[in-house]
Amino acid sequence: MSDIHEHKILILDFGSQYTQLIARRIREIGVYCELWAWDVTEAQIREFAPNGIILAGGPESVTADNSPRAPEYVFNAGVPVLGICYGMQTMSEQLGGKVIQGVGEGEFGYAQIEMLAQSALFKDIEDAVSADGKSLLDVWMSHGDKVSAIPEGFVAVAKTDTCPFAAMSCEEKRFYGVQFHPEVTHTRQGMRMLSHFALDICGCAANWKPSSIIEDAIERLKKQVGDDEVILGLSGGVDSSVVAMLLHRAIGKKLTCVFVDNGLLRLNEAKQVMEMFGDHFGLNIVHVDAENRFLDALKGEADPEAKRKIIGRVFVEIFDEEAKKCVNAKWLAQGTIYPDVIESAGSATGKAHVIKSHHNVGGLPDDMELGLVEPLRELFKDEVRKIGLELGLPYNMLYRHPFPGPGLGVRVLGEVKKEYCDLLRRADAIFIEELHKADLYNKVSQAFTVFLPVRSVGVMGDGRKYDWVVSLRAVETIDFMTAHWAHLPYDFLGRVSNRIINEIDGISRVVYDISGKPPATIEWE
């Protein structure tokens, strides 16, 4: 088995919104990488022993006092270095070049760079040719400052009309700087540039692939837990499902999954989870029907934050009770993933590389005295999904739209009642079913229904009815930080509305939410 961590790239984060994207791109190329804050020590870099280092972007100005710098050792480690945006500027300044503050002539958005010299980073890459025969590349810029003089030993590799050094290189030392962002899709050949850097310049082998990651995870799990028993809170979500499958492969019946049905799940979800993991895959599952317990605890509570806390607290109580019944369990498995582990490196203290302990089970009791097993803690969400496919989990389950931890508890506005949850479940199922039928489900990033605790007059036949209102919500987004409401066809919305009102006794009106984020959030609560 090839060692998936044998070749690796270290990415130093200076606070750019794109930094995690760089890491995901390097991994897509097939190379393992880690993301650390910019102020790491020489000892930490030596211990990690990367085959190459990427200095990422950031919002600061190299010209400002106390702005972040790469550790000096980066340039003495004898490995290739790629500086992106701020990373290029700090590389230039630290090695003797000059950076000037942008005054009203920064570049933001699409730009075309003209190639001035050959470079291993840009080998055989070209988007267009200028009238005088120069290679041109379509890239994405986002910078105010710019390099005004490059360090000794470097050559200018590319320019734009306003940026004389859009790319620079010192081929002898294998140092490269690009003022644009190769990691975003708007830079058309960005993946090829990153591939040149990781595979050709750094000499990494593409060992990081789903089948190898699974083999490695199973080996490590066997080594970590030995013959001990493990307990896992299985929610039916992507992360816990993939953890369950990995552990099942590694230790079989020594895994006990606890599935808590809180009464706040989607239509038939509990049944589907039990059928898939229990009947189909043969996992050992304890099914706890706790609907009444959760609804009793939520009685009379309308505040969203308080509802979240109640749902979290009751879950922990139930999980703790079930864990105590598993008297031989020595380990608790969790679906922690890499973004949970990374603290954004743009922190004011500069101490962001201190890994945060992340409990996505929501603060389990300290007296559980179980060791922690986190087989996904190196993986991004898209990698977890690919591994899930490889492990045999169904595509439509792995690529389902996000569902909040508290479930319908935050999609029923105000107080949560069984009647409201039952109506909402059915309305939401109709909306999702129609999205699939119209081939729209995968064209939106997230779609769901919200129950509004308001009654509205409606007409059915000759009679009037006075029933509840639901709102449909569908958004398009890349990163869920900002989102646009989805412009679904009117006839489609009409069809969904008609079905909900005609098929569900208790709902008299359907509205469509046309708020973007910002100013609204994606979820209503």
From Swiss-Prot:
GMPS ATP-PPase domain sequence ranges: 208-400
InterPro entries assigned: Class_I_gatase-like, GATASE, GMP_synth_C, GMP_synth_GATase, GMP_synthase, GMPS_ATP_PPase_dom, NAD/GMP_synthase, Rossmann-like_a/b/a_fold
EC code(s) of this entry: 6.3.5.2
Broad enzyme group: ligase
GO molecular function: ATP binding; GMP synthase activity
Residue numbers annotated as active site: 85, 181, 183
Entry annotated with the keyword Transferase: no
SUPFAM superfamilies for the chain: Adenine nucleotide alpha hydrolases-like, Class I glutamine amidotransferase-like, GMP synthetase C-terminal dimerisation domain
Residues in Glutamine amidotransferase type-1 domain copies: 8-207
Keyword Nucleotide-binding set for record: yes
Catalyzed reaction equations: XMP + L-glutamine + ATP + H2O = GMP + L-glutamate + AMP + diphosphate + 2 H(+)
CDD domains xref list: GATase1_GMP_Synthase, GMP_synthase_C
GO cellular component annotations of the record: cytosol
Keywords, ordered alphabetically: ATP-binding, Glutamine amidotransferase, GMP biosynthesis, Ligase, Nucleotide-binding, Purine biosynthesis
This protein's pathway: Purine metabolism; GMP biosynthesis; GMP from XMP (L-Gln route): step 1/1
Amino-acid positions noted as binding ATP in the UniProt annotation, renumbered to this chain: 235-241
Pfam families linked to this entry: GATase, GMP_synt_C, NAD_synthase
Alphabetical list of PANTHER family matching this protein: GMP SYNTHASE [GLUTAMINE-HYDROLYZING] (PTHR11922:SF2), GMP SYNTHASE-RELATED (PTHR11922)
NCBIfam families membership: guaA_Cterm, guaA_Nterm, PRK00074.1
Job description of the protein: Catalyzes the synthesis of GMP from XMP.
Subunit annotation: Homodimer.
Name of the molecule in the record: GMP synthase [glutamine-hydrolyzing]
Organism: Shewanella sp. (strain MR-4)
Record gene name: guaA
